[in-house]
């Protein structure tokens, strides 16, 4: 990886692509690296520059100019922090969360009776993600306010997985109330120092001001083809704008407004599907060899 060379490393080779990551992120994904890299290096993720910096343990020197420093603990080879605080019922409630740099959501909260917060009044059912054991289902809602360190964030889109299915699929015995993912972390430059037990968060001011939004179309897309630029509807949520537009699983998207689908990547398509409540999206669709137009009216569902 770059100039990095490592011998005698343990690797896991999966014969079948269970996660189908390439299809859902729209770029070729050949593997995942985890604990061994993070444990042997100080890892800095610069989301705005799309850069990953590995610094040898002992060579990284923390300075306040690099951001705010927060303790982390490593359990079951995973990093956890107590730097997250929720606001509910007029009180601040610190929680322990997993720092999940491989997750696309902002915040995931365990949905079980023993937790100190309730499911929001307004939620939608959704497929929250995928693991080696299958699809993770649950609810999506909004948390009014939370803090990550000293930074306050409002109206965060949060995932609430079905407790039984989520616990079985995660398979971790570590006590935690949820996890934070890249939709939240991308608003910072993040440095993970497993060796000395801390993380550093340097805010990206423009990204901190961005609102938390969720897909307003109600459809999930997968990419296919050698260049991963052929886009198909993978799932349509009931009573969603996509369902109202007559879209079905297996439909191929040829044009999205004035854009040929082949000119867009997955992230750009989802950004178009977050353009605003009431916005119309014109689609050219192919189904079973037939081509037709349809209009999709975006709706903020949470």
Residue ranges with predicted function:
Residues 1-302:
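Pepsin/retropepsin-fold aspartyl endopeptidases
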């Amino acid at each position: 990886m770059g100039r990095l060379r490592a011998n005698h490393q343990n690797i896991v080779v999966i014969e079948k692509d269970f996660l189908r990551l390439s299809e859902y992120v729209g770029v070729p994904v050949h593997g995942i690296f985890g604990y061994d890299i993070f444990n042997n290096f100080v890892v800095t993720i610069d989301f705005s520059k799309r850069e990953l910096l590995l610094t040898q343990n002992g060579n990284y020197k923390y300075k306040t100019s690099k951001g705010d420093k927060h303790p982390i603990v490593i359990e079951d080879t995973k990093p956890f922090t107590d730097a997250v605080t929720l606001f509910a019922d007029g009180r601040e409630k610190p929680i322990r969360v997993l720092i999940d740099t491989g997750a696309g959501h902002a915040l995931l909260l365990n949905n079980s009776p023993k937790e100190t917060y309730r499911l929001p009044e307004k939620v939608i059912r959704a497929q929250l993600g995928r693991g080696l054991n299958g699809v993770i289902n649950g609810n999506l809602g909004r948390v009014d306010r939370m803090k990550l360190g000293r930074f306050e964030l409002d109206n965060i889109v949060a995932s609430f997985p079905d407790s039984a299915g989520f616990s079985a699929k995660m398979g971790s015995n570590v006590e935690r109330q949820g996890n934070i993912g890249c939709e939240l972390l991308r608003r910072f430059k993040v440095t993970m120092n497993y060796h000395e037990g801390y993380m550093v968060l340097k805010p990206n001011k423009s990204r901190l001001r961005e609102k938390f939004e969720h897909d307003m179309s109600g459809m999930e897309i997968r990419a296919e083809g050698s260049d991963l630029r052929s886009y198909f509807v993978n799932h349509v949520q009931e009573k969603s704008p996509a369902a109202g537009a007559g879209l079905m699983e297996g439909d191929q998207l040829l044009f999205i407004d004035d854009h040929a689908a082949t000119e867009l990547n997955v992230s750009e398509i989802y950004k178009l599907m977050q353009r605003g409540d009431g916005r119309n999206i014109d689609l050219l669709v192919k189904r079973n060899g037939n081509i037709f137009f349809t209009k999709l009216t975006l709706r903020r569902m949470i």
